[in-house]
Amino acid sequence: MPFMPCRGRERADPVVYIVDDDPDMNDALADLLDSAGMRSKSYVSADAFLSTPIGEEPSCLVLDVRLRGANGLDVQQELKRRGIALPIVFITGYGDIEMTVQAMKAGAVDFLAKPFRDQTFLDAVSQAIAVDRTKRRAVRCGDDLRARFATLTEREREVMTLAVAGLMNKQIAGEIGVSEVTVKIHRGRAMRKMSARTFADLVKMAIELDRAAPALHDRRDQSSAPRYAGGTTPQSMAASYG
């Protein structure tokens, strides 16, 4: 069974935000999405969209490049400035290669020139939703792991850090000045609290915690990087488990 660190579920069905200054185009795209079972919210200006809070559900943005009083590429940069990683499908009747390249380099999922086929549009939106779903799941899983790690005692964190670094129970006992039996107890408790079915799972969880915040499981100082014995890392340990 693959390693699945997260337990949370998505909060709602996906939503597609549509920003086009042509009301008829907005309505047509909304109807198309509705026919495919997708929810949508439409806006006729960049300002109207940018003043709207983005929900917690998986979502994407269908954005016209040339809006009245605004440039779709500028909207893309503004979202990035705000830290909003919303996948974007650009649509335009005036696209050129330079504009397409600029949008894609900035992270756009697709760039569609009007007129486009209905299925082409739906495929692009589905891909964008999938991208956002993956990102949100990664965040959710990271939050879940951090919450579990926070329940460990200082000693359990200490033992976990040394164990995933490759030290045997006897070595850990000598390192922290306790008996080997005590190490086994703390290691078992750490695995239960982390919901790790196997030690390999615990190693993979340590890798995920490292990626999110390396100092989370440093046993000496919460502000410094973790120390691993003999050059061993959680990544190399995980590789040995396949």
Predicted regions and their residues:
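Recognition helix of helix-turn-helix DNA-binding domains
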Residues: 168-201
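Active-site residues of response regulator receiver
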Residues: 64, 92
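Acidic, metal-coordinating helix/loop segments flanking the phosphotransfer/catalytic sites
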Residues: 42-60
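Basic, Lys/Arg-enriched C-terminal extension of HTH/homeodomain DNA-binding domains
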Residues: 191-242
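Conserved acidic segment of CheY-like receiver
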Residues: 12-25, 29-33, 46, 61, ...
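Short amphipathic alpha-helix used as the core "switch/output" element in two-component signaling
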Residues: 73-86, 102
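C-terminal output helix
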Residues: 96-98, 112, 116-126, 175
